[in-house]
């Protein structure tokens, strides 16, 4: 398949009324040897701030000499935008080869078992597949929507993060902050450390309750780590970061007070990693 054909093929699996659940993802990835279980995954959810937090974390891990896979959504121009290792997007030829492999599964003898597979499930599976085959040191997976039933949530992460909670996708996730927080907290795993960003109290209470039930150690913004704005310089923000593990002054490459919260959370994730 060429670039146009890959776009058309995967777009044909786009739907406005998906059947949510992880069963198809589990079946699909099992047919590919369960690549998602061969990775060290940092799983990031939340309403806003995911992209910036992931970018900060990716850069810091990269400076440590690690090969860092990043899966993000949505794509800007082409599906290659969603899958990258450090600064390099998946090559178009490699993506096309993987799409051919997945097409043979979805349209071949396993078609019945995989009926209802969506565009996002396919590209998520391809990301896991690519990162495993490239043997990245760590894969940062961004939740697409919600968390509990999001197709990224088949992984067994070493670390999870929830950035913020706001009213988004209310028709699917719930019409209250508490209901949405419960969906976002679906990525929390038994005993796996959780870092939370600047989350409103009513939503944080739900997340903390779920984390406690799953015995997940927590690093909470404003409690276990703090950031304080020190001023704007050029195109970035200067802030102090304080936690039991480190204290220091940092500068972001992006303007906006919310960016110091994103950067602070990325530092907390790095120190937990």
Model-identified regions with their sequence ranges:
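Aromatic/hydrophobic pocket-lining residues that form π-stacking "cages" and hydrophobic walls in ligand
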Residues: 57, 127, 207
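Short functional linear segments
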Residues: 1-46, 52-66, 71, 107-114
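Acidic, Mg2+-coordinating active-site environments of NTP-dependent enzymes
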Residues: 110-111, 135-142, 157-249, 263, ...
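Histidine-centered active-site/metal-ligand motif
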Residues: 43, 75, 169-170, 258
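Short, surface-exposed alpha-helical segments at coil->helix boundaries
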Residues: 4, 22, 96, 204-208
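A short glycine/serine-rich beta->alpha loop
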Residues: 111-115, 251-257
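Short glycine/threonine-rich catalytic loop with a Thr-x-Gly-x-Asp
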Residues: 68, 234, 254-266
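ATP-dependent carboxylate-amine ligase catalytic core
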Residues: 29-37, 63-155, 171, 201
């Amino acid at each position: 398949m060429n670039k146009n054909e890959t776009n058309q093929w995967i777009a044909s699996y786009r739907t406005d009324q998906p059947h949510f659940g992880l069963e198809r993802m589990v079946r699909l990835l099992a047919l590919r040897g369960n690549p998602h279980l061969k990775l060290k995954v940092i799983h990031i959810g939340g309403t806003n701030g995911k992209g910036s937090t992931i970018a900060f974390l990716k850069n810091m891990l990269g400076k440590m000499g690690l090969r860092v896979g990043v899966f993000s959504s949505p794509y800007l121009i082409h599906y290659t935008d969603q899958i990258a290792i450090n600064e390099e997007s998946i090559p178009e030829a490699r993506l096309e080869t993987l799409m051919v492999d997945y097409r043979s599964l979805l349209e071949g003898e396993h078609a019945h078992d995989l009926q209802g597979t969506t565009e996002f499930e396919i590209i998520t599976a391809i990301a896991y597949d690519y990162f495993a085959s490239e043997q990245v040191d760590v894969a940062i997976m961004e939740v697409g929507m919600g968390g509990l039933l999001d197709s990224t949530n088949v992984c067994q992460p070493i670390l999870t993060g929830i950035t913020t909670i706001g009213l988004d996708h209310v028709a699917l996730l719930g019409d209250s902050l508490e209901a949405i927080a419960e969906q976002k907290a679906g990525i929390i795993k038994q005993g796996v450390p959780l870092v939370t960003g600047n989350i409103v109290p009513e939503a944080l209470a739900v997340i903390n309750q779920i984390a406690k039930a799953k015995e997940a150690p927590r690093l909470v913004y404003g409690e276990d780590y703090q950031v304080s704005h020190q001023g704007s310089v050029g195109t970035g923000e200067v802030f102090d970061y304080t936690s039991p593990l480190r204290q220091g002054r940092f500068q972001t490459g992006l303007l906006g007070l919310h960016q110091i919260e994103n950067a602070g959370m990325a530092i907390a994730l790095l120190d937990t990693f």
